[in-house]
């Protein structure tokens, strides 16, 4: 059964985030041609800051669009030295500063926070031990995350996560299941 047209807005820091998310969403059954990517300009200063400051604007666009068509929004931002909850709180503060509501419970708006960064997850998903404080090297090519993302799809589709799964990765799977999966399931009915 095909899914009717859904636009997913992907707000992210860089091409590695984009490649990782596109492969994940495709593996979860979404049409990757229906993803609109808003990515930090490469020479535009802090990518984290760009994503954080762009979030309220894209949230407004999402709220308007969802009245017209089934839509979702996913923001990906590295935790760096902060915690997952710290990054989520920063998004809320950006919305508060613009006097707008952060996220309603029924909104298909997910915030994904790789800790320390996306390379931590890729390293783990490729079968290595990790800790979320260490910095792991970038891939030579963004598309090199294929095996890692395929393993993530298996993890997110399983009922139980392994005990050594990084907490931020578990939180991301939970965020997807809670915020994005209900929209997809409703489109399949």
Each model region followed by its residue ranges:
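Conserved SAM-binding loop
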Residues: 10
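Eukaryotic endosomal/vacuolar membrane-trafficking regulators centered on PX-domain-mediated PI3P pathways
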Residues: 43-53
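Phosphate-binding/switch region of NTP-binding enzymes
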Residues: 13
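C-terminal accessory helical subdomains adjacent to catalytic cores in phosphodiester-
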Residues: 1-7, 16-41, 54-189
């Amino acid at each position: 059964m095909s899914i009717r047209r859904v636009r997913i807005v992907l707000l992210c820091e860089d091409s590695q985030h984009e490649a990782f998310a596109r492969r994940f969403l495709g593996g979860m059954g979404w049409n990757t041609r229906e993803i609109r990517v808003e990515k930090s300009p490469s020479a535009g200063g802090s990518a984290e800051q760009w994503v954080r400051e762009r979030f309220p604007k894209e949230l407004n666009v999402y709220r308007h669009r969802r009245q017209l068509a089934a839509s979702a929004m996913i923001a990906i931002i590295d935790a760096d030295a902060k915690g997952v909850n710290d990054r989520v709180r920063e998004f809320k503060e950006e919305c508060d500063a613009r006097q707008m509501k952060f996220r309603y419970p029924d909104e298909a708006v997910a915030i994904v926070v790789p800790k320390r960064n996306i390379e931590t997850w890729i390293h783990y998903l490729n079968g290595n031990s990790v800790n979320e404080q260490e910095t792991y090297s970038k891939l030579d090519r963004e598309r090199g995350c294929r095996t890692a993302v395929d393993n993530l799809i298996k993890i997110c589709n399983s009922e139980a996560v392994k005990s050594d799964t990084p907490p931020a990765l578990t939180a991301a799977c939970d965020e997807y299941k809670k915020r994005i999966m209900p929209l997809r399931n409703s489109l399949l009915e």
